[in-house]
Amino acid sequence: MPNTINTNFVPWFRSVAPYIHLHRGKTFVVGIAGEAIAAGKLQHLAQDLALIQSMGVKVVLVHGFRPQVNEQLLAKGHTPRYSHGMRITDEVALDCAQEAAGQLRYEIEAAFSQGLPNTPMAGSTIRVMSGNFITARPVGIVDGVDFQHSGLVRKVDTAGIMQTLNFGAMVLLSPFGFSPTGEAFNLTMEEVATSVAIALQADKLIFMSEIPGIRMQPNEPESEDNPIDTELPLAVAEKLLANLPSPTQPSDAAFYLQHCVKACKEGVERSHILPFDVDGSLLLEIYMHDGIGTMVVDEKLESLREATADDVSGILQLIEPFEKDGTLVKRSPTEIERDANNYSIIEHDGVIFACAALYPYPEARTAEMAALTVSPHVQGQGDGERVLKRIEQRAKAAGLDSIFVLTTRTMHWFLKRGFKQVDPDWLPDARKRKYNWDRKSQVLVKKVS
């Protein structure tokens, strides 16, 4: 059993390493719905947030308190009142909000202070700091409704928050703001988190919500044919949002989506809607290729491009397992660095998941495609075909008639994509001299002109 565990753990941990490097030093604003805390999810969320901070991420945590305030209002015999999806905060509601905020901040700080041995928080030294970082203004009267002590964010103390983050602390914000005259306003977690993310130009805005994400057809019921859309380019998200009814409660598809769109339009690279009821969803989204929930991004994260010298380490990491098992011929770092411009790569969120190299033989009007590799984590998603097509385009643009590959294990994959098997004697003289007759690679050719 220990050997099996170790065997599974090592490749998984290696696959996570690129994301650890990618996110180190980045700033994430995380909004946790009050419903998550009411559902008893705070302890696990605190552990996950402590973990990502220990790996170098700067975290701003904004908590909600909608159900907690409602519970206190009902206990006092008052019915919670809303309009346009926003609470109408009278004097009683303001008192309840202040009391709920104080209690939740106490619980959150306590969760980050636990460090018992043999627990996920063992040895952690998480400093949680709060402050009057939000200046607010009143909502006022909208469509004849006086929102009283409900407010909107007027200004974010960016310098103060960054100073606290650079000190190594996690910033904790309640959905409260104060006017220049000292008047308190009840805000929403979603608006505070979005405003802070925009002001900081954070790398990520993340909502831990009660919904699993945005479905491809939001108005249709859950089904196998209507799964969660894991990645929404900003333009698609805007179009989708325009066709959704105005949200009145957190379970509405547009409730979080509107804030994600706003953040991405104003400089936040990526915004996420994650389900808090899935244990570890925050870690799955940040440190896995496919993630969980829905991400709104201002451009398609996955890019197909030619490699540069900066990509050498990523290419080496991708092809190394295939060199070890004999699928690929071993190449030295020096060779790959020298030939970096020959490679085409698929990069997703800063990590290389597929590559191939093109080595022309102009005198024979052909070129070798070498080191075609797709990460096991994304195989079966068409990345191999995309890289192959790019190599074909590059060969055609160079005025060549064909491309060829040498393979010992993947002949049928190439045959299905238009390659024909030929004798090794077909190879250009310069390549034939380097042919390894002991390896006995199959030679396959495809016309591109």
Language model segments and positions:
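Conserved acetyl-CoA-binding loop-helix of GNAT-fold acetyltransferases
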Residues: 374, 380-397, 405
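Nucleotide/pyrophosphate-binding catalytic subdomain
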Residues: 1-270, 309-314, 347, 360
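Conserved N-terminal entry element of GNAT/NAT acetyltransferase domains
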Residues: 287-309, 449
